[in-house]
Amino acid sequence: MDISTITDAFGDVMLMQPSAGVFVAAVLAAILLGMSAFASGSEIAFFSLSPTDVAELEDEKTDADKKIQMLRDDSERTLATILITNNFVNVTIIMLLNYVFAGIVEFGPKAYWLQFLIITVILTFLLLLFGEIMPKVYARQDSLKFCRRCVGGILFARKLFWPLETILLKSGILAEKIIQKENHVLSVEDRKS
């Protein structure tokens, strides 16, 4: 790729006046990015509590501590809640930001590679940085404090996604049984050989 190809690509990009829908989509994407950060931080916070934190939770000093303990006791469902929430939010963010870029920037035929670069690579990087990496680093600093702040949101997401969680957990149990059965059959056949 030479410099003229790059120059032609940037010359084939036009900025457009954003509509009200584009502004709404951008605001929603920003709010959802916060929700993605919340879910990512929660994943680390709930599953990286130190033994000291766990001991403090067992004293159940606050209502939040009782709720955190309840979520930890059903850790598979809690993890399913967090993962479903995070995936749902991240997919929605990508769709909204695609709409935002389509409403602001028009890429001509010479700039299709630039469109791919901006929408796929840069948006993915920003989503990973602000929705995954930074929240996890922040949550790891004081996991118990983060858990206490987010336990209400996790319980709300748990109620919201209960049917999906149940399907996910049941299918996981079924897959585990199938794999165990296949491993048993293989080990019996290995013994005969």
Model-derived features: where do they sit?
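Membrane-embedded alpha-helical segments of inner-membrane proteins
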Residues: M1-R191
